[in-house]
């Protein structure tokens, strides 16, 4: 009888572990999510800053510009004069200096002008006509957005040229005429009807309403405020905005050798810089202390470089008008901190009296709206047009934005309001329910990417660069622009500094750090990756190793 | 930007490693770099668990599970058998834990290194017998808590990297999972060399060290940036190359993430800082010569 042996197999393995669903161990799963970056959240025009910087980093400049002009038709303008709250919010600010967003925007905006890139034309043409009253930043932005939606738009402008503060208020050395003309020409090429030298009064409104489906009021605030101590009838006393406007129209106001500017905001410093370029010595008297002047810090630095003397925390008590000169009795003050921000209540400090003498005085203490008669047709409060969150006035079909409404007086804020009004007008005309895009930003603001969510290991320190400045002696010779744009190399290296907070750039870290090979690259997906549900154990390494907070872990319940 | 690592799909999903396991991540880059024409040798360890519950395997290559003391001897036998059969392309890799390398398997490894046997030996070093409940090994660092050193280990970690370099083997490298590209590059480099190649990979054990599930790569990088575990290569016991060294990051940033160090007082933290600084300076001198 033959002996039988038990056969021992040479290979014991009969299969692979990938038949085991380790995903059942999990209590949370990673979700790819485009999240709100702090810069985007702070941007007055709701600009998708990480998106266009990412495109610039890839040298896709036309695409970057196209992403910019979705929200703002004037990147070359805002790249120069925006107060850039984005940089104040930038997560990199806590690390090695905020990304130079404003300078990057200028480079792309200028490139668009030099390359002659044109704005996209509307894809549909609607029959409805919209009247935009006021051709400043808010009105032009609203007209642009409405035109993109296909509406027929007419802009009514009381002055001979469009632009408002951009044409008449900002000195040429901050925004050259060529740049502004280029930006405007490109916008008007979309086919917008313009009626310049056309002042719309309150009693014109009802006739406008017959011809137009909706009205946007963007009248601005060009009337310079005055101070009771000063007689504005005297030829030696100038109003700030009017002074800037005259110079921008090409006049040369006769100021004399010594000019005193009253005010501490951006307009006051623009007035001071303009007077310096006209050859005068300039002193600025401001109520606020030096470290709390309302002007932007870089504007203050430039003014000081240009030899403007700043008397911060000072108030004019008495004005002595002579035939050739004005003598100002001044006193040092501190501001009463018990008053809310924006309300100035100076407390004179006795014994600090001093005297300043000047050949002319320019008042730059703020601007008011001109709303005579408008209170009979719409609700006005504190000299401003009352509007709701959607910028609708009390009168159906009439919307308002920019400086004529209670908004921060920045050009970018006005551009943002014009855009917001355009979507409100569109909603009003199409009778949609209010779920606009601008509201979604507010809803998501809780989910802003925080500094702690950025994985610094992936971002070696890299110094921030700033725009260069023309040497002072050269600056004072003329009204040429003083800030020097980034060059190509600077633009490349500085755009690389962007963390792209909350915006996936397909770095593949989530893929490489998964011990379970549960992350799959898939370029056909908007989120670029998918999670293999059957294997993911929910460890969260992909979330932790994402350099920019674009993956979040979501708890799973009821499994 | 980002990592670029070429992988062959040898390591499978569905393996039994804990969520976030650094050792599984290390195995991914080791076997996916070596490719399917490789024979693995694995002693008892977490690696044996991750290799798969019989009869399933997480690695699409032959794996021989040997005894705890015999990884290097088993690898020697397989490498010599392949040579005797005229096979000069199949690679042999032993993948063992620190218990199976620093302690129990050390004799066979040292003698194989002395004979310059032709295989790759990779130690996945999680600084203790983590598979059996976190007892101390000779790799456990000074003052770290383990189940068998409840007041903290009274002696320092054995410097196996330098011991192996002192065998004057063709290639010795240190690596860790927070630097996956560096790890894969070192495995690829070892693959292209003949003789005994040794890589010690620091693989933080989430459970044994007391770490969050997502903290493996982070603590691994802190080990490097604090100077606890510099990443470097030594060729023929002589030529030293530094890849990633100390950035002067204070040791407390590394220790405070780990529950195994939470009993430390300030004086002990400073003591560890001094030891780490001294070790880093001593090692650093070798890169300049």
Regions found by a protein language model. Give the residues of each.
Chain A
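N-terminal Rossmann-like FAD-binding beta1-loop-alpha1 element of flavoenzymes
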Residues: 128-154, 268-276
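A conserved FAD-binding loop/helix module that cradles the flavin
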Residues: 271, 404-429
């Amino acid at each position: 009888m033959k002996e039988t042996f038990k056969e021992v197999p040479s290979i014991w393995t009969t299969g692979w572990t990938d038949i085991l669903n380790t995903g059942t161990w999990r209590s949370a799963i990673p979700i790819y999510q485009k999240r709100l970056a702090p810069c985007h959240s702070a941007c007055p025009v709701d600009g998708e800053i990480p998106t266009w910087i990412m495109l610039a980093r890839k040298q896709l400049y036309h695409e970057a510009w196209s992403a910019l002009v979705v929200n703002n038709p004037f990147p070359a303008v805002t790249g120069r004069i925006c107060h850039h709250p984005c940089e104040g919010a930038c997560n990199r600010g806590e690390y090695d200096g905020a990304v130079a967003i404003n300078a990057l925007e200028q480079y792309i905006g200028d490139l668009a002008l030099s390359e002659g890139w044109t704005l996209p034309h509307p894809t549909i043409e609607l029959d409805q006509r919209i009247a935009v009253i006021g051709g400043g930043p808010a009105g032009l932005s609203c007209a642009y957005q409405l035109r993109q939606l296909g509406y027929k738009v007419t802009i009514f402008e009381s002055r001979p040229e469009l632009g408002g503060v951009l044409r008449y208020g900002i000195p040429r050395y901050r925004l050259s005429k060529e740049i502004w003309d280029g930006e405007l020409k490109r916008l008007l090429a979309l086919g917008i009807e313009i009626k310049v030298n056309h002042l719309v009064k309150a009693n014109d409104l009802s006739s406008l309403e017959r011809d137009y489906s909706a009205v946007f009021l963007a009248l601005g605030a060009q009337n310079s405020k005055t101070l009771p101590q000063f007689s504005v009838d005297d030829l030696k006393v100038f109003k700030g905005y009017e002074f800037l406007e005259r110079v921008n129209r090409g006049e040369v106001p006769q100021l004399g050798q010594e000019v005193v500017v009253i005010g501490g905001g951006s307009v006051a410093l623009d007035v001071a810089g303009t007077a310096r370029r006209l050859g005068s010595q300039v002193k600025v008297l401001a109520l606020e202390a030096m470290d709390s002047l309302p002007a932007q810090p870089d504007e203050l630095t430039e003014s000081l470089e240009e030899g403007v003397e700043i008397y911060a925390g000072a108030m004019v008590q008495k004005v002595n008008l002579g035939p050739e000169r004005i003598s100002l009795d001044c006193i040092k003050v501190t501001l009463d901190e018990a008053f809310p921000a924006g309300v100035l209540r100076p407390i004179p400090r006795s014994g600090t009296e001093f005297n300043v003498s000047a050949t002319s005085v320019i008042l730059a203490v703020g601007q008011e709206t001109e709303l005579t008669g408008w209170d009979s047709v719409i609700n006005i409060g504190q000299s401003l047009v009352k509007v709701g969150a959607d910028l609708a006035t009390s009168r159906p079909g009439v919307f308002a934005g920019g400086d004529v409404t209670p908004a921060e007086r920045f050009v970018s804020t006005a551009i943002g309001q014009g855009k917001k009004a355009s979507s409100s007008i569109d909603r009003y005309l199409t009778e949609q329910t209010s779920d606009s895009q601008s509201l979604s930003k507010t809803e998501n603001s809780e989910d802003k990417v925080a500094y702690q969510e950025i994985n610094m290991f992936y971002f070696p320190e890299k110094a921030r660069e700033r725009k260069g400045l023309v040497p002072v002696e050269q600056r004072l010779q003329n009204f040429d622009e003083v800030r020097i744009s980034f060059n190509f190399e600077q633009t490349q290296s500085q755009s690389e500094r962007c963390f792209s907070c909350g915006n996936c750039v397909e770095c593949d870290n989530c893929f490489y750090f998964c011990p379970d090979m549960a992350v799959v690259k898939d370029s056909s997906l908007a989120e670029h990756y998918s999670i293999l549900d059957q294997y993911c154990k929910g460890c969260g390494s992909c979330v932790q190793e994402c350099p920019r907070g674009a993956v979040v872990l979501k708890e799973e319940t009821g499994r | 930007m980002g990592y670029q690592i070429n992988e062959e799909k040898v390591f499978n999903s569905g393996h039994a490693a804990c969520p976030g396991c650094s050792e599984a991540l290390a195995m991914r880059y080791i076997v996916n770099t070596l490719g399917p024409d490789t024979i693995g040798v694995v002693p008892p360890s977490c690696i044996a668990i991750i290799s798969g519950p019989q009869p399933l395997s997480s690695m699409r290559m032959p794996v021989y599970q040997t005894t705890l003391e015999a990884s290097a001897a088993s690898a020697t036998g397989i490498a010599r058998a392949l040579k005797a059969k005229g096979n000069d392309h199949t690679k042999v890799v032993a993948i063992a834990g620190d218990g199976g390398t620093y302690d129990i398997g050390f004799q066979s490894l040292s003698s194989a290194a002395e004979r310059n046997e032709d295989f790759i030996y990779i130690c996945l070093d999680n600084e203790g017998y983590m598979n059996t409940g976190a007892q101390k090994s000779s790799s456990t660092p000074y003052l770290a808590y383990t189940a068998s050193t409840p007041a903290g280990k009274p002696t320092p970690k054995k410097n196996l990297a330098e011991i192996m370099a002192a065998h004057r083997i063709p290639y010795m490298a240190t690596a860790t999972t927070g630097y996956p590209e560096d790890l894969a590059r070192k495995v690829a480099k070892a693959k292209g060399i003949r003789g005994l190649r040794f890589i010690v990979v620091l693989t933080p054990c989430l459970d044994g060290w007391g770490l969050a599930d997502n903290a493996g790569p982070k603590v691994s990088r802190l080990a490097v940036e604090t100077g606890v575990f510099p990443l470097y290569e030594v060729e023929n016991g002589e030529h030293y190359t530094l890849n990633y060294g100390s950035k002067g990051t204070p040791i407390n940033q590394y220790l405070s993430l780990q529950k195994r160090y939470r009993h430390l007082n300030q004086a002990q933290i400073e003591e560890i800082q001094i030891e780490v600084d001294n070790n880093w300076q001593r090692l650093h001198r070798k890169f300049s010569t």
